[in-house]
C-alpha cells in the first residue's frame, strides 16, 4: 500500500522483501552451456533483500505552457514550474555527498522578462534533495543552469541528457557539455547563475582541426573523472552504424582552431572501441575450415557503449547477440579485451550502472513484460538470422516513446537458473503504484557512492503509445499536477554503507582498441561471403546455412538456416528451418524483413517457433520504434505461448 509522507511532494511506497523475479521456469533450460554464460554456474544466487522505494520531491507542474501560467498560487517561491510530458524529464546521478541527485527538467509557464522568475524557462538542470531537507530558500530543489548569462555558455548545444556529477561536487556532465561552478559546490548558496559556466565538449574529426567537431551521444563519465566514453553515429547510403569511443577530457581555455573559439573541453587521445585491423564478429567463418561457420565469443562487438565498471577497468556495451534475438549487456576489460556477459535473460536490456564495489549491477530490462519473447523465447538457437535481424529485434523493445523497462538488481555473476535478478518495484500492479505496468523505468539508473541507494525514474504511458487507434487505453495521471513522470530512490535498508577510495586516472590507451585519427574512414566489417556453410553444434548435430547477397550493393540479402538435431548443450535440441530476407526500405534507419520460422525444440525444453503460412513481414524504424507487421511469429515454450505485439502497440 502506498504511504504518503507529510510533504505533499514525497511519497514512500513502503518496504517490501522482494523475491527474485519469478519468470517462467523455462529459463532453467538450454542456457547451461558455459560458452553462453558470463561465469560458470557455481555461484549461489543471493538472498532477496528488503528495498524501500521513495518518491523524490520535484517542482510543481504548470497548468499550461502559457506565459505566466506558473503563478505564485502554484509556486509561491517563484522558482519555476515544470512540464508534464514524460520525455521532458530525466533523472541523473547522485551528487558525491549522496544527499542530493541531479535531474533534467523542462520549465514552462514562466513570466515575461524582466521578472526575476523569467529565468525558469526551457530545459534546465536541477538538484533535488534526497535526504528530506531543503535548500535555504525553502525549496527541495535548486536550479543550477537557470539564468546563466549567455557569455558563460558560448557554443553550448541543447543536449542536456544523462546529467552526471563529477566527484568534486562542482561540475556536471550534461549531454555534450560540462557545467562548472568552481570554486563552489553546486549545492552552495554561493553557486549562483552568474558564477556558473557551461563549456561545450568538442571531438575533433578534421585533419586540420577545423569545424565544430563530430557528433557525440550517450556520454558516460569514467570513474576517474578524467576520461569519458561516448558513441559516434553514422547514417548514409550504406545504412546505419555506430561505434563506441574512449577519450580524455582536457580543458582548453583559449582554442586556436575549431569551433567554438571559446573556452571548451577537448577530447584528446581518442580510441575507437574496435580491435585494430578488420573488426572481429561473433558469427564468423572458421579460419581453418572455410566452408564452416563458428561462434567467436572473444569478438569485441561494441554496438552501443553504455558505461564503465566502478573500478574503471571495464567498458559496458550492447553487442552482437550470443543467442538468436537475445540482446544482452557485455563488459570488456579495457586492457586485456576479456569479455563478460552480464545478462542472459531473453528479453532486452539496455540502461545499467555498476555498484561502487562492482559486486552488483542495476539494469533496466523488458524482462517480465514478454515484449521480446515471441522472437527470443526459444533458447540455445545460434545467432545466425541475426546477421539481418539484430537491428530490427532491438527496436521492438519500445512502442514509440514508451519503454517497457523495469529496474532490476543483479549480482556480479548474472542471470543463472531460476535467478533472474530482483525487481526493485515489486507489488500488486495497482494503478499509480510503483509496480503499475503502465509506469516504466527510464534511463539511467544510478548508484549512490555508498552503495545503499539507487536513483531512477519512471514514465507513465501516454499518447500515441496508448489511446486513439492504439489498442491500449491511456491511464489517468496519478502524479501531482498531472505529470507523467516521477523520480524515485530505492534504499537497500539492510546494507552497510561502503567507503570507496577515489580512482586514480587510468591510462589513455586501450591496447586492443584503434587509436582515432581525424579524417580517417570508419572501419568496415568484412562480411561472410555468400555461399553455403555448415555450423556444427558443440554437443551434436549441425546447421546448414545459406547466405545470399542482394543486387542492390548493400550486401547480405537473405539468410537461410536448416537445423538437424543441432545442440550446443546436452538434451537441448533444435530442428527445423528459419529464413530472413531483407526487403527494400525508404530510409537507412528502417529495417524491413520477410521472416519465416519453423523450429522445434526438444529435450529438457519443449518448444516451437513458427510463422504463419505467408510468413512474418515486418518493418520498423530504429528511431521511432513503431511495430508494424503482417502475418505472425509465435513462440511456445513448455506450453506457454508468446505472441507479437499488435500493430502500433
Task: Give the ranges of each region predicted by the language model.
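Bacterial N-terminal signal peptides
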Residues: 20-31
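Sec/Tat signal peptide C-region and signal peptidase I cleavage site
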Residues: 33-37
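Small-residue packing motifs within transmembrane alpha-helices
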Residues: 18-21, 353
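N-terminal secretory signal peptides that target proteins for export/translocation
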Residues: 1-15
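Sequence signature of WD/YWTD-type beta-propeller architectures
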Residues: 38-649
Amino acid at each position: 500500500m502506498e504511504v504518503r509522507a507529510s510533504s505533499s511532494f514525497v511519497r514512500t511506497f513502503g518496504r517490501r522483501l522482494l523475491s527474485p523475479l519469478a519468470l517462467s521456469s523455462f529459463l532453467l533450460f538450454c542456457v547451461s552451456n558455459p560458452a553462453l554464460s558470463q561465469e560458470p554456474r557455481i555461484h549461489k544466487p543471493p538472498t532477496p533483500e528488503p528495498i524501500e522505494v521513495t518518491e523524490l520531491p520535484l517542482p510543481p507542474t504548470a497548468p499550461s505552457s502559457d506565459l505566466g501560467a506558473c503563478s505564485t498560487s502554484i509556486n509561491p517561491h517563484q522558482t519555476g514550474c515544470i512540464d508534464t510530458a514524460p520525455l521532458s524529464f530525466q533523472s541523473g546521478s547522485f551528487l558525491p555527498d549522496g544527499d542530493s541527485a541531479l535531474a533534467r527538467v523542462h520549465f514552462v509557464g514562466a513570466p515575461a522578462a524582466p521578472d526575476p522568475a523569467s529565468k525558469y524557462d526551457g530545459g534546465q538542470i536541477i538538484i533535488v534533495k534526497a535526504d528530506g531537507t531543503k535548500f535555504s530558500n525553502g525549496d527541495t530543489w535548486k536550479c543550477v543552469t537557470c539564468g546563466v548569462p549567455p557569455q558563460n555558455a558560448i557554443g553550448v548545444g541543447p543536449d542536456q541528457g544523462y546529467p552526471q556529477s563529477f566527484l568534486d561536487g562542482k561540475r556536471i556532465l550534461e549531454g555534450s557539455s560540462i557545467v562548472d561552478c568552481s570554486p563552489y559546490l553546486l549545492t552552495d548558496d554561493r553557486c549562483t547563475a552568474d558564477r556558473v559556466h557551461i563549456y561545450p565538449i568538442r571531438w575533433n574529426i578534421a585533419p586540420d582541426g577545423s569545424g565544430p567537431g563530430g557528433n557525440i551521444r550517450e556520454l558516460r563519465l569514467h570513474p576517474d573523472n578524467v576520461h569519458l566514453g561516448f558513441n559516434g553515429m553514422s547514417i548514409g547510403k550504406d545504412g546505419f552504424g555506430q561505434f563506441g569511443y574512449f577519450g580524455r577530457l582536457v580543458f582548453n581555455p583559449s582554442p586556436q582552431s575549431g569551433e567554438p573559439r571559446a573556452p571548451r573541453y577537448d577530447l584528446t587521445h581518442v580510441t575507437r572501441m574496435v580491435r585494430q585491423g578488420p573488426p572481429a564478429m561473433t558469427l564468423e567463418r572458421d579460419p581453418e575450415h572455410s566452408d564452416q561457420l563458428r561462434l567467436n565469443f572473444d569478438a569485441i562487438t561494441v554496438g552501443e557503449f553504455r558505461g564503465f565498471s566502478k573500478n574503471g577497468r571495464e567498458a559496458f556495451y550492447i553487442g552482437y547477440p550470443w543467442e538468436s534475438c537475445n540482446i544482452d549487456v557485455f563488459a570488456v576489460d579495457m586492457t586485456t579485451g576479456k569479455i563478460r556477459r552480464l545478462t542472459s535473460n531473453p528479453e532486452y536490456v539496455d540502461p545499467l550502472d555498476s555498484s561502487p564495489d562492482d559486486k552488483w549491477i542495476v539494469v533496466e530490462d523488458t524482462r517480465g513484460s514478454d515484449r521480446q519473447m515471441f522472437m527470443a523465447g526459444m533458447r540455445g538457437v545460434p545467432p545466425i538470422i541475426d546477421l539481418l535481424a539484430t537491428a530490427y529485434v532491438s527496436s521492438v523493445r519500445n512502442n514509440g516513446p514508451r519503454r517497457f523497462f523495469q529496474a532490476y538488481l543483479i549480482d556480479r555473476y548474472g542471470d543463472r537458473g531460476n535467478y533472474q535478478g530482483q525487481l526493485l518495484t515489486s507489488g500488486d500492479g495497482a494503478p499509480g503504484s510503483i509496480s503499475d505496468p503502465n509506469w516504466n523505468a527510464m534511463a539511467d539508473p544510478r548508484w549512490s557512492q555508498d552503495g545503499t541507494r539507487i536513483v531512477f525514474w519512471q514514465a507513465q504511458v501516454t499518447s500515441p503509445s496508448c489511446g486513439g487507434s492504439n489498442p491500449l487505453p491511456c491511464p489517468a495521471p496519478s502524479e501531482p499536477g498531472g505529470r507523467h513522470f516521477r523520480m524515485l530512490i530505492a534504499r537497500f535498508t539492510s546494507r552497510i554503507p561502503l567507503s570507496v577510495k577515489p580512482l586514480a586516472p587510468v591510462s589513455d590507451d586501450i591496447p586492443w582498441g584503434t587509436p582515432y585519427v581525424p579524417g580517417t574512414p570508419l572501419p568496415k566489417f568484412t562480411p561472410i561471403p555468400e555461399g553455403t556453410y555448415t555450423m556444427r553444434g558443440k554437443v551434436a548435430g549441425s546447421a546448414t546455412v545459406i547466405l545470399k547477397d542482394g543486387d542492390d550493393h548493400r550486401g547480405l540479402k537473405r539468410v537461410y538456416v536448416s537445423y538437424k538435431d543441432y545442440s550446443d548443450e546436452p538434451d537441448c535440441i533444435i530442428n527445423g528451418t528459419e529464413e530472413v530476407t531483407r526487403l527494400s526500405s525508404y530510409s537507412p534507419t528502417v529495417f524491413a524483413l520477410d521472416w519465416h520460422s519453423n523450429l522445434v525444440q526438444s529435450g529438457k525444453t519443449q518448444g516451437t517457433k513458427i510463422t504463419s503460412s505467408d510468413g512474418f513481414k515486418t518493418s520498423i524504424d530504429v528511431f521511432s520504434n513503431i511495430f508494424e507487421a503482417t502475418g505472425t511469429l509465435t513462440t511456445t515454450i513448455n506450453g506457454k505461448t508468446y505472441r507479437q505485439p499488435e500493430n502500433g502497440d
